């Protein structure tokens, strides 16, 4: 959106995020910036070391939201089965669509062309029979391209697929799997499911299924929000508990406001806190609590501060709540 509205930004390294003065975090970066190693969720200071000539913009959320809504409206012309993942990403199930003679490949191509024509924005797409492969395919021909994994190609594609490419397999998990001699989905196909279950539990079964091209998750139009949170990256590290308590006091009204938007009765399943230390290690602590409560959050944070800080400075403080499962909430209300 920024490059569309200002063509001078198109070919230079650009990122949306915190300023050079205050410590912030990169929200997103364009492809010229990514060539220097700049990534989302990266501290701004790190990004500037990698790319000193990086152009930083504070971001215009309203403009991004407007573009996102327009794109969702384009999606809806082809199917009602849409599962948004973020402002700029969504799953679409077009298996019952009559557009383009029912061809998912042609539908994806037409959607991309429509986005470019109506919004002057580029889009990438992945087409596959199951969700996780569509996600992987969407990253194959970025930017402004698409990649198709037809049903008859799944077995061959998956066999050679590195496990690190599977959504949910992070660097730590990939390293553990590598140490076990498991680098590709083909390696997992030749391994024992019982061993994976013993070593990784539920994740072991998911890994086994994905390695066989199995993903039975359906598109969920009405994805239920599971949590609400608010956090602050600090301009300078803090080392004294009263400073942390003051930040929580300032953050709490915003958490209360955000929660009230989705749960006016403020009923929750759990609430907790997050602290990020100056070595970038993160700790969270939460427990079951029926209703948003500031005093309990402060007590929880104080406990984490005393037991887990170890003299380190704190660079981020966050508060969050986990929402009640709607079905469980109905049961509780019926019980009352």
Predicted regions and their residues:
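Gly/Gly-Pro- and Ser/Thr-rich, intrinsically disordered tail segments characteristic of DNA damage-repair
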Residues: 1-199, 205, 321, 325-336
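DNA-contacting surface of Y-family translesion DNA polymerases
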Residues: 165, 173-316, 324-329
């Amino acid at each position: 959106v920024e490059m569309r509205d200002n063509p001078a930004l198109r070919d230079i390294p650009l990122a949306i995020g915190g300023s050079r003065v205050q410590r912030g975090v990169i929200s997103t970066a364009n492809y010229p910036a990514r060539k220097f190693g700049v990534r989302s969720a990266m501290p701004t200071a790190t990004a500037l070391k990698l790319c000193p000539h990086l152009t930083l913009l504070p971001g215009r959320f309203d403009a991004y939201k407007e573009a996102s809504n327009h794109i969702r409206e384009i999606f809806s012309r082809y199917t009602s089965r849409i599962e948004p993942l973020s402002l700029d990403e969504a799953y679409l199930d077009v298996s019952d669509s009559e557009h383009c003679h029912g061809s998912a490949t042609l539908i994806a191509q037409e959607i991309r062309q429509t986005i470019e024509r109506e919004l002057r924005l580029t889009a990438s797409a992945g087409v596959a029979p199951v969700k996780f492969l569509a996600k992987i395919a969407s990253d194959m021909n970025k930017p402004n391209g698409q990649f198709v994994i037809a049903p008859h190609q799944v077995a061959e594609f998956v066999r050679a697929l590195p496990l690190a490419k599977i959504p949910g397999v992070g660097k730590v998990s990939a390293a553990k799997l590598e140490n076990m001699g498991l680098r590709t989905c083909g390696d997992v196909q030749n391994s024992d499911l019982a061993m994976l279950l013993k070593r990784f539990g539920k994740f072991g079964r998911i890994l086994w299924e994905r390695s066989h091209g199995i993903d039975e998750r359906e598109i969920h139009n009405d994805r239920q929000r599971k949590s609400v949170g608010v956090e602050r990256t600090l301009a300078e590290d803090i080392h004294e508990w009263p400073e942390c308590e003051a930040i929580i006091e300032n953050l709490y009204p915003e958490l209360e406001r955000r929660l009230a938007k989705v749960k006016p009765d403020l009923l929750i399943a759990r609430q907790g806190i997050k602290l990020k230390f100056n070595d970038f290690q993160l700790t969270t602590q939460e427990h079951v609590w029926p209703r948003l409560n500031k005093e309990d959050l402060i007590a929880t944070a104080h406990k984490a501060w005393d037991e887990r800080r170890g003299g380190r400075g704190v660079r981020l403080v966050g508060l969050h709540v986990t929402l009640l499962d709607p079905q469980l909430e109905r049961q509780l209300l019926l019980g009352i």
